[in-house]
From Swiss-Prot:
Main subcellular localisation: membrane
Topology versus the membrane: Multi-pass membrane protein
Any Gene Ontology CC annotation: gap junction
Function of the molecule: Structural component of the gap junctions.
Subcellular location: Cell membrane; Cell junction, Gap junction
One MF term in the entry's GO annotations: gap junction channel activity
Region spans: Disordered: 433-465
Name of protein: Innexin-11
Chain segments annotated as transmembrane: 29-49, 105-125, 195-215, 286-306
The organism of origin for this protein: Caenorhabditis elegans
Keyword entries, A-Z: Cell junction, Cell membrane, Gap junction, Ion channel, Ion transport, Membrane, Transmembrane, Transmembrane helix, Transport
Length: 465
């Protein structure tokens, strides 16, 4: 029961995220799972079976055979073609890089290391995206809510996302406009408060995926010691097409030679025995498959990196994306295509309100939740921007700010007085309820005095301006 709970707890780390694309999932989800499966398969054969079997002289007792096989497995073997005489090879000629076989013991650990490297960029993206003001993972999850088929739930979720995104985008814009430096010493940490933080971090994650796949191809060639071909997979396919067997190619040889010594009384006997590497039957198939899978990953990562670089770096693609969604919305201003006013409004909406991160989040929502939900969200954000833009002159003036503060304070004081007054109301018998709720003389005088004070404050503000 405990093992099942542990497995279910680990399953969430193997599940896909909602803030990525198809190329990311190939890198951080599918590839590590494939590598883990291969690592477990090889481990079962190594530690649960006989990965190597050697041929010994008849005089060897059973204990010697077990010792020799364990020794040859833990030490390096070397490859010799069937036509060569082992006795004619010098010791330094036997363990040259072209002949020495030292990788097969480490295959499970090498595969686990590769899985960790493929998974690492996703953790980097998860960490930094959670430290930004926009919770993109939660935004996409809310957009993908299956309950959005109901109109009320859909409108509620759009309202929640609009408020969250508007608040986060407004905060980022204020930080950049006021040039607030939260971190005085390490200034580059202030980058997380910029309006392009998530976009650049995601693009950096794409670069890491690309570099990782390229590095894994190189490390595989280095690990297997394939010096004859710089591109291992193509070399193996070429040998197979040309009909060259493993006895001459040396790639994952089934048979190898092992040298070991046995101490007998005062003498040391040296033996060279031929061993069958059964494990290489699995290794050959696994690494050929992985090599071509990595080539596919390299191509997909390149395409995805170029695609996101173009749409994030060049503003014209952001404006085109938003304009297409606004054209699909119910807004009357965008029924006419290619109008100058429409282009101007979209340009201001993208550059002054959404910025780079806002468009990036909308792209993720459109990719995961569909174009219909994304269009409704774009429309809601544009309506919020349009309302803010129309009231910018009134809200941004010093007079209106002070007047708004005074009005708010006056309304608050009136509400407080009404609350105190309500506690003193006496319901008199024989009088209508409306008569008993009328304010008394003291309240009228207090209210008039407060109104006179508010008018004086407004006059002082206007005079100072």
């Amino acid at each position: 029961m405990v093992m099942i709970e542990t497995f279910l707890g680990m399953a969430k780390y193997l599940s896909p995220r909602e803030d990525d694309d198809w190329s990311d999932r190939l890198n951080y989800l599918m590839t590590p799972n494939i590598l883990l499966a291969f690592s477990v398969l090889i481990s079962f054969k190594q530690f649960g079976g006989r990965p190597i079997e050697c041929m010994f002289p008849n005089k060897f007792p059973g204990s010697w055979e077990q010792y020799a096989e364990n020794y040859c497995w833990s030490q390096d073997t070397y490859f010799v073609e069937p036509t060569q005489d082992v006795s004619l090879l010098k010791k330094e000629e036997r363990y040259t890089p072209d002949r020495q076989l030292s990788y097969y013991q480490w295959v499970p650990f090498f595969l686990l290391l590769q899985a960790a490297f493929f998974r690492a960029p996703s953790y980097l993206w998860k960490y930094f995206s959670n430290h930004s003001g926009i919770r993109i993972h939660e935004v996409v999850e809310k957009a993908k809510d299956s309950a959005n088929v109901e109109e009320e739930v859909r409108e509620k979720n759009i309202l929640i996302l609009k408020r969250h995104l508007s608040s986060a985008l407004r905060f980022q814009a204020n930080m950049e406009r006021k040039k607030v430096q939260v971190h005085k010493t390490v200034t580059f940490l202030n980058f997380q408060y910029s309006s392009g933080f998530i976009s650049w971090i995601y693009l950096f994650t794409k670069v890491l995926y690309f570099l990782n796949v390229f590095a894994q191809l190189y490390l595989m060639n280095y690990f297997l010691g394939t010096n004859r071909h710089h591109w291992y997979g193509f070399g193996v396919v070429q040998d197979i097409v040309q009909g060259e067997p493993w006895e001459r190619s040396g790639y994952f040889p089934r048979a190898a030679v092992c040298d070991f010594e046995v101490r007998q009384v005062a003498n040391i006997q040296r033996y060279s025995v031929q061993c069958v590497l059964v494990i290489n039957i699995f290794n050959e198939k696994i690494f050929v498959l992985l090599w071509f899978w990595y080539v596919i990953l390299l191509l997909s990562s390149t395409v995805s990196l170029v695609q996101w670089f173009i749409v994030l770096v060049f503003p014209c693609f952001s404006k085109w994306f938003v304009k297409q969604h606004l054209a699909l919305s119910t807004l009357q201003n965008f029924n006419q295509r290619n109008s100058r006013r429409e282009d101007s409004d979209v340009s201001k909406f993208v550059t002054q309100y959404l910025h780079k991160d806002g468009v990036f989040v909308l792209r993720m929502v459109s990719s995961h939740a569909g174009i219909i939900f994304a269009t409704d969200l774009v429309q809601a954000l544009y309506e919020a921007y349009d309302f803010q833009d129309k009231n910018k002159d009134v809200q941004g003036s010093p007079v209106s700010d002070d007047l708004q503060t005074i009005s708010t304070g006056a309304e608050s004081s009136i509400r407080q007085r009404k609350t105190r007054k309500g506690s003193r109301i006496e319901y008199k018998a024989g009088f209508p309820i409306s008569t008993s709720l009328m304010p008394d003389k003291d309240d009228i005088e207090s209210s008039s005095t407060s109104s006179e004070e508010d008018q004086k404050r407004v006059s002082n503000v206007i005079t100072n301006i």
